[in-house]
Amino acid sequence: MQYKTFLVIFLAYLLVTEEALAFWGALAKGALKLIPSLVSSFTKKDKRALKNIFDPYQKNLDLELERLLSQLQ
């Protein structure tokens, strides 16, 4: 319960003093850096999930290897 009282007093202090500009500015600056990085990390995962595992050259190499192995047997 004491931490809630301290938090209310701290926020009230920030609202009436000039330090509030620096505090809220630092929070906003951090949020502006954090939000785009979170959004981009989620979109990268989606793109990676949709991307095909093999590129065309790898598929061709796999088919060629299977063909050569079948000739050996």
From Swiss-Prot:
The keyword Translocase does not apply. Keywords: Cleavage on pair of basic residues, Cytolysis, Hemolysis, Membrane, Secreted, Signal, Target cell membrane, Target membrane. One of its GO terms (cellular component) is extracellular region. Residues 47-73 form a propeptide. Residues 1-22 form the signal peptide. Its main location: secreted. InterPro entries: Antimicrobial_4. One of its GO terms (biological process) is killing of cells of another organism. Amphipathic peptide with potent activities against Gram-positive bacteria (MIC=5.6-30.0 uM) and weaker activities against the tested Gram-negative bacteria (MIC=15 uM to >45 uM). It has high hemolytic activity against human erythrocytes. May act by disrupting the integrity of the bacterial cell membrane. Belongs to the non-disulfide-bridged peptide (NDBP) superfamily. Medium-length antimicrobial peptide (group 3) family. This is Heterin-2. It comes from the Eukaryota. Expressed by the venom gland. It is found in: Secreted; Target cell membrane.
